[in-house]
C-alpha cells in the first residue's frame, strides 16, 4: 500500500479542493493511503472517505507570500513541512502540495533530499500538444541558471518519466534552441548538444524550436530553468487566450456565431480538452529521493485527483528507483 502525504492547506481553494480530490482518488484506487496534513476541523468538513485516510493536525501553514527558505526553517510545524518530513522518515512515499512553489522546492531540496549524483533537480511538467499526447519539459523554473551537465541529466530524467509514467517507448528527446541546426545556440546549448548526441541510450532528435513544441515535435524537451519557466507561462497564456477569444467571439457574434458553436460543440470541447493539461497531473520536482509534486494553486478537486493518479503511477513504476540505479552508475564510470 503506497502512502501519499498531502499538504491540505496549500493553494487557493484549500482545504476543500485538496480533500475533495482525495475523496475522489480513494474511490478510484484501492491500493493507496492518504495522509492529510492541516487543520483537522476544516479538513473534516469535506472528508467523506473513512478508510485508508488519516489526518495529522497542525495549526501552522505556509502562505503564498512567505519567503520560501525562511518559511521552511521557521514554520517547522506547517502542513507542507510535516508532509515532507513524513517522506524523509519513511512514513509516506510521496508529497503533494498546491501551496507556495518556492517553499515546496526548498522542502524537497532540504528535507526530502537529492538523489546521489544528481546535480540540480529540475521541475518537470507535461504540457499540451494539438494532437493531445502532450510533451514533458524540464527545467520549468527550479533553477535560474543551469550547466550543460544539468541539461544532460534532465534529458535522462525526462526519458525515465516519459517511458515509465506516460508509457512512451524510446521517447524522443529534443533540446530547445533558436534553430534546428546543430551549430545553433549559445555555448550552453552547443555543449549540451554534444553531450546528448554522444549518449546512445537517449533517443536524441536534435534541436527543436519553441514554435514546434505544441505540434508534438518531441516527447521530452530540455532547457534551462529561466527559459523553461518563460515557455511554460507563454503556453499557459496562449491556451487561455485562445479559449477566451473563442468564447468572446461566440457570445458577441450574434445568432450565426451561436448556431455555428452549437454545430461545433463536440469539436470545441475536444480542443479545450487538448489545451487543458490538468489531467496530466502536477509539476514534479524530479531528481529527489521521492516524488514531490506541485499541483496548480488554483486546482480543483478533479485536478487534485489527477495529480494523485500521477503520483500513484510514479510509485508503481518506481521511476525514482530507476533514476537512483541509473545515476549510481556514474560512480563506476
UniProtKB/Swiss-Prot annotation:
Compartments, record wording: Cytoplasm
Protein task: Catalyzes the reversible formation of acyl-phosphate (acyl-PO(4)) from acyl-[acyl-carrier-protein] (acyl-ACP). This enzyme utilizes acyl-ACP as fatty acyl donor, but not acyl-CoA.
Keyword list, A-Z: Cytoplasm, Lipid biosynthesis, Lipid metabolism, Phospholipid biosynthesis, Phospholipid metabolism, Transferase
Entry GO MF terms: phosphate:acyl-[acyl carrier protein] acyltransferase activity
The name this protein goes by in its record: Phosphate acyltransferase
EC number(s) from the headed UniProt entry: 2.3.1.274
GO cellular component, one term: cytoplasm
Main location: cytoplasm
Amino acid at each position: 500500500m503506497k502512502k501519499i502525504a498531502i499538504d491540505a492547506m496549500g493553494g487557493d481553494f484549500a482545504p476543500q479542493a485538496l480533500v475533495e480530490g482525495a475523496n475522489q482518488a480513494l474511490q478510484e484506487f484501492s491500493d493507496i493511503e492518504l495522509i492529510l496534513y492541516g487543520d483537522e476541523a476544516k479538513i473534516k468538513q469535506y472528508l467523506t472517505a473513512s478508510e485508508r485516510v488519516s489526518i495529522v493536525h497542525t495549526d501552522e501553514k505556509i502562505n503564498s507570500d512567505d519567503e520560501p527558505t525562511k518559511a521552511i526553517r521557521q514554520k517547522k510545524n506547517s502542513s507542507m513541512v510535516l508532509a515532507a518530513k513524513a517522506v524523509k522518515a519513511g512514513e509516506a512515499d510521496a508529497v503533494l502540495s498546491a501551496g507556495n512553489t518556492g517553499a515546496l522546492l526548498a522542502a524537497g531540496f532540504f528535507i526530502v533530499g537529492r538523489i546521489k549524483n544528481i546535480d540540480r533537480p529540475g521541475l518537470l511538467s507535461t504540457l499540451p500538444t494539438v494532437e493531445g499526447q502532450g510533451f514533458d519539459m524540464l527545467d520549468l523554473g527550479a533553477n535560474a541558471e543551469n550547466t550543460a551537465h544539468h541539461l544532460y541529466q534532465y534529458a535522462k530524467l525526462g526519458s525515465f518519466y516519459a517511458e515509465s509514467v506516460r508509457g512512451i517507448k524510446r521517447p524522443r528527446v529534443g533540446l530547445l534552441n533558436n534553430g534546428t541546426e546543430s551549430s545553433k545556440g549559445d555555448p550552453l546549448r552547443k555543449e549540451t548538444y554534444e553531450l546528448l548526441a554522444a549518449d546512445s541510450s537517449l533517443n536524441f532528435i536534435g534541436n527543436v524550436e519553441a514554435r514546434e513544441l505544441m505540434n508534438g515535435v518531441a516527447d521530452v524537451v530540455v532547457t534551462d530553468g529561466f527559459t523553461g519557466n518563460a515557455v511554460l507561462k507563454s503556453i499557459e497564456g496562449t491556451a487561455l487566450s485562445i479559449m477566451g477569444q473563442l468564447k468572446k467571439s461566440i457570445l458577441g457574434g450574434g445568432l450565426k456565431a451561436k448556431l455555428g458553436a452549437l454545430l461545433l460543440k463536440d469539436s470545441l470541447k475536444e480542443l479545450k480538452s487538448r489545451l487543458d493539461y490538468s489531467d496530466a497531473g502536477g509539476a514534479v520536482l524530479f531528481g529527489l529521493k521521492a516524488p514531490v509534486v506541485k499541483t496548480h494553486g488554483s486546482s480543483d478537486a478533479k485536478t487534485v485527483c489527477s495529480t494523485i493518479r500521477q503520483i500513484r503511477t510514479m510509485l508503481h513504476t518506481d521511476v525514482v528507483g530507476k533514476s537512483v540505479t541509473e545515476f549510481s552508475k556514474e560512480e563506476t564510470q
